[in-house]
Amino acid sequence: MVRSFNFLNFIFLVIIFGCGDSESESSNDIVIPEESDSTWNLIWNEEFSGQELDNSKWNILRWRPGWVNNELQAYTNRDTNLYFKDGCLVIRALVEPGYFDEDYLGNSYNSDYTSGRINTAGKFNKTYGRYDIRAKLPKGRGSWPAIWMLGENISTDGWPYCGEIDIMEHVGYEDDIIHGSIHTETFNHNLNTQKSGSK
């Protein structure tokens, strides 16, 4: 069965896409490889070159703590967690003891941690293609930046039946390791049968 994915139902989970502003980070130089194959046709791109997210491409998610993966942080739509700096989109996690807000359903919550989360659900999907992504990741225990693709049928079939491709996940305490996984009805982390690789 072929599934169409919400490409860039990239769920950017914790800290940074593009650039960062931590003193402990390495060089801000980004090397852009030369295009080696001209047989591809560009059908969608996002350079994050403006001053705000393009609402025709992106959704900003507002979720209370625990909504996804039992995570401690709340996902906000505030410019302290999601902003542009030096031509890059920054998604930043913060420690904010006593933070109070409402989720997208209007339910109140408290959280000591906040972050940003965006996706393209309902705005872009593609079954096949090549996806080039450039991101700078944080290091540090507790961070978990990730870029995922989920099946566009997630709202009707649920996970893992919709399928998931983890393009990149970085567990903060594993300094130089990036993980990629595929989750399906048969192969998923609930059954401990997911298909994964690390580099």
Language model region names:
Residues 2, 20-25:
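Intrinsically disordered, low-complexity segments
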Residues 23-199:
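GH16 jelly-roll
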Residues 3-12:
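Sec-dependent signal peptide recognition
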